[in-house]
UniProtKB/Swiss-Prot annotation:
Record's keyword terms, sorted: DNA-binding, Nucleus, Transcription, Transcription regulation
Gene name for this UniProt entry: Sox8
InterPro entries in alphabetical order: HMG_box_dom, HMG_box_dom_sf, Sox_N, SOX_TF
Biased composition (Polar residues): 354-366, 448-464
Domain notes: The transactivation domains TAM and TAC (for transactivation domain in the middle and at the C-terminus, respectively) are required to contact transcriptional coactivators and basal transcriptional machinery components and thereby induce gene transactivation.
Protein name according to UniProt: Transcription factor SOX-8
Function recorded in the entry: Transcription factor that may play a role in central nervous system, limb and facial development. May be involved in male sex determination. Binds the consensus motif 5'-[AT][AT]CAA[AT]G-3'.
SUPFAM superfamilies: HMG-box (SSF47095)
Transactivation domain (TAM): region residues: 221-299
GO CC annotation: cytoplasm; nucleus; transcription regulator complex
Organism of origin: Mus musculus
Biased composition (Gly residues): 40-51
Residue ranges, annotated region (Transactivation domain (TAC)): 347-464
Cellular location(s): Nucleus
Stored Gene3D superfamilies: High mobility group box domain
Length: 464
């Protein structure tokens, strides 16, 4: 442990030495002029010891490592690091630095003795040192304690002179917790993910991390290359923070399914959302081919405008007949209608596919706008015969599709003629038939004869 007699003999050395070195240790607290002899001697000893240990620590690493570290640290601006705000002020930065309490007699003794002992026994752990110093202090007699008591009194008077209106305000216990969460959220701000971020239930963490976003927010809105358009749209609404937190959760959890019932519809861009309110959540799964592109080639005459919504294909060939309707062409396959043969297992991909920026940038569509339905329903009479022949042609396949072609498409959309789309395959039992249905819906354009187009070849669909 520690030689008691030696430690006992050490403290009452010259009172000026230990005591004044004390006032020098906490020079942020008191402006008491240190007596040169004691404090500078001690300070020099301590400084020398510290410099030696720093050099020794440096020697542990090879020169190349040290050079690399200094090279990295040199280029980093440490003023950008968000500093966690400690203290119970609710995150408000205090203009003036914290004024510490004046040291009492034990602190005067402990700091001076700790400095001396740390130089003599560098292997001693600080906590063990403190325990030992406390025991020793209790064993000291009044006469031995007197120099420290006098120095503490002098520090107190000096402190009162320096800070006349000082009032001791002990910290509240909970400040430890807030400090920790501040620093944590500072690191979160530093590492916002590069993947797409969705705001599914981003109310999470808004209240919790509210205060620190004011202090730690030094970088701009997140614009990684894969950020979808909805993110930019929301960034203008000032909800960047929740996006970050939520995006981190979604990316970490391996792109879980988004529950569309939780999406705040008002925040998504209007063209995506114009008709989404009546869609079933599971309906999007029909339109998902595995690779997002075509699997079956079709005749050029029948798929002049193969519309893809998140990799889906509504082959709206009627678009050619009416100039007002936009041509939705998938960027890679203008003459191929996507066949979702593997539509079943692809549930996680729909989220990235449906909101991914490539579809936003390369096609001018969200879900079909209302004008489109008007234009396509105008073609309904022309194409009913064709779709009927399509239906009868694969009525002999694994299921009877004629009910899918019944004259009642898109009954969920009340304003449109009941002849275009209806989704009877909302239910999982009908889901595998989406591919032949969609390919059968590749209607011939208005100017081509409706009777002489070749039937595409269909593969048998199996649920994996």
């Amino acid at each position: 442990m520690l030689d008691m007699s030696e430690a006992r003999a050490q403290p009452p050395c010259s009172p000026s030495g230990t005591a004044s070195s004390m006032s020098h240790v906490e020079d942020s607290d008191s402006d008491a002029p240190p007596s040169p002899a004691g404090s500078e001697g001690l300070g020099r000893a301590g400084g020398g010891g510290r410099g030696d240990t720093a050099e020794a620590a440096d020697e542990r690493f090879p020169a190349c490592i040290r050079d690399a570290v200094s090279q990295v640290l040199k280029g980093y601006d440490w003023s950008l690091v968000p500093m966690p705000v400690r203290g119970g002020g609710g995150g408000t930065l205090k203009a003036k630095p914290h004024v510490k309490r004046p040291m009492n007699a034990f602190m005067v003794w402990a700091q001076a003795a700790r400095r001396k002992l740390a130089d003599q026994y560098p292997h001693l752990h600080n906590a063990e040192l403190s325990k030992t110093l406390g025991k020793l202090w209790r064993l000291l007699s009044e006469s031995e304690k007197r120099p420290f008591v006098e120095e503490a009194e002098r520090l107190r008077v000096q402190h009162k002179k320096d800070h006349p209106d000082y009032k001791y305000q002990p910290r509240r216990r909970k400040s430890v917790k807030t400090g920790r969460s501040d620093s944590d959220s500072g690191t979160e701000l530093g590492h916002h993910p590069g993947g797409p971020m969705y705001k599914a239930d981003a109310v999470l963490g808004e209240a919790h991390h509210h205060s620190d976003h004011h202090t730690g927010q030094t970088h701009g809105p997140p614009t990684p290359p894969t950020t979808p358009k909805t993110d930019l749209h929301q960034a203008s609404n000032g909800s960047k923070q929740e996006l970050r937190l939520e995006g981190r959760r979604l990316v970490d959890s391996g792109r879980q399914n988004i529950d569309f019932s939780n999406v705040d519809i008002s925040e998504l861009s209007s063209e995506v959302i114009s008709n989404m309110d009546t869609f079933d959540v599971h309906e999007f799964d029909q339109y998902l081919p595995l690779n997002g592109h075509s699997a079956l080639p079709t005749e050029p005459s029948q798929a002049t405008a193969s519309g893809s919504y998140g990799g889906a294909s509504y082959s709206h060939s009627g678009a050619t007949g009416i100039g007002a309707s936009p041509v939705w062409a998938h960027k890679g396959a203008p003459s191929a209608s996507a066949s979702p043969t593997e539509a079943g297992p692809l549930r996680p991909q729909i989220k990235t596919e449906q909101l991914s920026p490539s579809h936003y940038n390369d096609q001018s569509h969200g879900s079909p706008g209302r004008a489109d339905y008007g234009s396509y329903s105008a073609q309904a009479s022309v194409t009913t015969a064709a779709s009927a022949t399509a239906a009868s042609s694969f009525a002999s396949a694994q299921c009877d599709y004629t009910d899918l072609q019944a004259s009642n498409y898109y009954s969920p959309y009340p304003g449109y003629p009941p002849s275009l789309y209806q989704y009877p395959y909302f239910h999982s039992s009908r889901r595998p038939y989406a591919s032949p249905l969609l390919n059968g819906l590749s209607m011939p354009p208005a100017h081509s004869p409706s009777s002489n187009w070749d039937q595409p070849v269909y593969t048998t669909l199996t649920r994996p």
